[in-house]
Amino acid sequence: MEGRHKEYRIRFSPGWVEVVQDDVTIPGRRALITGATGLLGRAVYKEFKENSWHVLGCGYSRARPRFEYLNLLDAAAVKALIQDFKPHVIIHCAAERRPDIVESQPEFASLLNVVASENLAKEAAGVGAFLIYVSSDYVFDGTSPPYREDSVPNPLNLYGKTKLEGERAVLHNNEGAAVLRVPVLYGDVEKLSESAVTILFDKVQFSNKSANMDHWQQRFPTYVKDVASVCLQLTERRLQDPSIKGIYHWSGNEQMTKYEMTCAMADAFNLPSSHLRPITDEPVGATPRPWNPQLDCSKLEKIGIGQRTPFRVGIRESLWPFLVDKRWRQTVFH
């Protein structure tokens, strides 16, 4: 069912100005996006918006003026918002995703990644909303890839543990919810440090200084536009099929180390890469990370859900605004 509300506009004509009232149709399908100010959340918000959904995006520190301010740790505020908006779907993108920050702020990370997710699951169930909880490949230890949805999790760090606890809390409190595990993400960042992939670009551009790049951990960089499309496809399939629930995996299919990512970035922009040095030793002293947490995505592929953008295409779209050499940017894109 679609709702209607009034909108006003000013009409100008020679010698005359008038205020005109129009009936505006509001799409009947309502989506609530948490973490809508973040890298993935922005992409999900845009994907649903462009596909005729009435979308309410929520954020915290960067919420105003575009998005609704919402403290996910305020259970009463979460309940009030969901009861008022009555979404058909909630895409839960908000999380503390940085492993090093989780290690240094464990209590806050647990509140956001676990407790807030549990509360959201309960409220979603209360209004009959389909909830997609975005999780991580870090729930696995990376020793026996590829990992299926029913593979036994064994997170190596606190971030992975909080995401796994969040999964279990969501599925325990909302049997109709879905968990979508994804790997490291990149996309249209507001600053290079917003993604563990795009932050590498400065190492590529400043070729006057050699840079040691990790060539040990195996990653599958995934474009946020692809994940957003999968969220939309899952949601629209769920509207027709209530069996769409439980755990799913989605990932890019190009296996790359950080060294290989930076070489691909250099290739995408025709930049030198000889200053980049591969380091094959396992990092020492850092927060433990899985060697190869590759996700098996066949469960979604078998039901015709998925979208993949080649890394060199997606990374070029994401990084060209940050090119130091503006001449190249003008030549290629204008």
Curated annotation (Swiss-Prot):
The molecular function terms of the Gene Ontology recorded here are: methionine adenosyltransferase regulator activity
Region annotation (Required for interaction with MAT2A) ranges:
319-334
Q: Where does NADP(+) bind?
A: T37, G38, L39, L40, Y60, S61, R62, N71, L72, C93, R97, Y159, L185
What InterPro entries does the annotation carry? dTDP_dehydrorham_reduct, NAD(P)-bd_dom_sf, RmlD-like-bd
In which pathway is this protein known to take part? Amino-acid biosynthesis; S-adenosyl-L-methionine biosynthesis; S-adenosyl-L-methionine from L-methionine: step 1/1
State the oligomer form and interacting partners. Answer: Heterotrimer; composed of a catalytic mat2a homodimer that binds one regulatory mat2b chain. Heterohexamer; composed of a central, catalytic mat2a homotetramer flanked on either side by a regulatory mat2b chain. NADP binding increases the affinity for mat2a.
Q: Any idea what this protein is called?
A: Methionine adenosyltransferase 2 subunit beta
State the organism named in the record: Xenopus tropicalis (Western clawed frog)
